Amino acid sequence: MDPFHEGGNAGGVDLRKAGEAIMGAMKAVNPNAVWVVQAWGACPYPAMIKHLNNGDMLVLDLYSENRPQWGDPESTWYRKEGFNGHDWAFCMLLNFGGNVGMFGKLQHVVDEYYKARQSKFVSTMKGVGLTMEGIENNPIMYELVSELPWRENKFGWQEWLNSYVEARYGNINNTKVHDAWMLLARSVYGASDKVLEQGCHESVLCARPALDVYQVSSWSEMEEFYNPDDVIRAAQLMVEASHEVKANANFRYDLIDITRQAIAEQARYVYDEIVAAYKAKDRKMFDYTTKRFLDILLQQDRMLSSMPDFMVGGWIRSARNLGTNAQESDHYEWNARVQITTWGNRNAAEKGGLREYAHKEWNGVLADFYYPRWKAYFEALAATFDGKPMKQLDFYAMDEKWTLLHNVYPYEAQGNPVEFAQTAFENVFGK
């Protein structure tokens, strides 16, 4: 229970009495009840919890890896008294909106955890937690945090990474795989404590078209903290290794995910070329690069059709299956489609700034939602080369059409992921 979470108004409320009333109501039902509360922003207010009995509350420090509240004096959300003697858990948030993309702070997460372990607040630290808004991404980071309580002494990510790769794939003894993960650990998973972006490095393929595209969701605070070429090289090594090793389920998933990230990086390079060509009034280069961008987008869509984890079909099917009749199923499908695109009506999407908050780089969405947007935008730009005014596109109207559809998407793999990744990498990078 989280009173005043994200914008609740505590004005005129006696916080001490409110906290005691909530706890009293819980104890009346179950004398052994423990109040689990999220630490986010200014909540839980110290005045609400400091008079409650220790042992009756467990505080989840939601964002321990970025803005810890357990009492770290270096945190922007520093609480001098921590959680006022209440039990708490060191939690990693990592992902906002369930966005698809690789991101993490391997060493920083380790450093922060052991900093807490060595602080005066360790006596009330009861464990770790995973508090991501969306799971099914970046398994390496969840594995790392889950392993922390079992290691008494601080360690470096290099020694841990080797054991992680062996545990994940089996004793494959392939240097290309290990080298690929070293590149990833130093790039997308090597964000420092200074990097405050909320969630993954977002794919330009999912962005609303413009000549100044940077991030996709309005809340991402995305930063350029790594060399995209390291990700592309890591994907190349994984693709090469896929010809040499016996691919278990984990390897197949990672091969698709790493190749997906590399293709997204390449798409951003091509996007920059499009902008440069347009500003230089180079029609030939503009036509070439826009076609290449759209081809890359469709190639990404096709590759992801080989892995159910990256297919919108399963998402929509799960939503429809919740309905007890056709009308309910249609409504749940609409909700599922809206949640990963517009987030709501025009007001929520445009004025609320939450469109694409939970965007997904998935098969089906790429081809049917993102491709038409980019194609229409490029066609509008192309027309200006002939002296025509720039057409004002109503992107929300385009987006809404997709949310109202009920076309059926496949939810089972449409091909061999190893072969699809190999083909995609060759088509995009020519290697």
Predicted regions and their residues:
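Ordered core of a single globular domain
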Residues: 248-301, 359, 363, 382-406
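Short, hydrophobic/amphipathic alpha-helical patches that form generic packing surfaces
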Residues: 139-150, 186, 233-240, 253-272, ...
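Polar/charged low-complexity regulatory segments
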Residues: 222-249
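N-terminal non-cleavable signal-anchor helices
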Residues: 205-206, 214-217, 240, 246, ...
